[in-house]
Design a protein with these regions (language model features):
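Catalytic alpha/beta core of large soluble enzyme barrels
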Residues: 4, 12-192
Length: 192
């Protein structure tokens, strides 16, 4: 994985891993189990940012963070699918493969640059050809249609583009959470 990724990228206002920022303004969503004390502490300060998960409604909620990319940030729309895959290939060739211990694994078995490639409607054939021609450089690739952020409920990243999105963005108002004040009454750690 390229760093910063996941939650760390939210804290730093950075794009996640090898990916450019999703758009100038977007929603970044993370799943959280309702039983996690740290989530309950967060939700107490920011209930407006949480909702029931459509994928695990019995156990999980989704936290929606409003993200605004820095002015000079590279955005998803600034790269086409092939340009993005070239970056993934470059990092795989120059970082992942040379950084591995060849004696700790089977030959030609490598870690992967975690990636989701956004593909525009006119790019699918070229992307398929590129992946096939360069298959030795990829361990795994997730492909997502260009409008995937609007096609899937509670997508991990969703562009703020409609009036409804703007209203949602304006309603989030994150409040700082002082985690130094968090106390757990019981030890929830399960060692196995």
């Amino acid at each position: 994985t390229c760093k910063p990724e996941g939650t760390a990228s939210l804290i730093l206002n950075a794009a996640s891993g090898i990916h450019p920022h999703h758009s100038r303004r977007y929603f970044r969503r993370v799943q959280a189990n309702r039983k996690e004390p740290v989530y309950a502490f967060f939700k107490a300060a920011n209930p407006q940012m949480t909702e029931t998960s459509v994928y695990n409604p019995d156990t999980d909620d989704v936290i929606t963070f409003p993200v605004e990319a820095p002015k000079k940030a590279i955005l998803r729309k600034d790269l086409n699918a092939i340009q993005f895959l070239e970056l993934v290939k470059l990092v795989q060739q120059c970082w992942v493969i040379p950084g591995g211990d060849p004696h700790s694994r089977s030959p030609d078995l490598h870690h992967n640059v975690s990636n989701t490639c956004t593909v525009r409607p006119d790019e699918w054939d070229e992307v398929a050809d590129f992946i096939w021609a360069n298959r030795r450089f990829f361990t795994g690739i997730s492909l997502l249609q260009d409008a995937g952020d609007k096609a899937y409920a509670q997508a991990p990243r969703e562009e703020v583009s409609s009036e409804g999105d703007i209203a949602r963005w304006n309603s989030l108002h994150p409040h700082r959470v002082d985690y130094t004040q968090m106390r757990e009454a019981t030890d929830e750690t399960e060692l196995k």
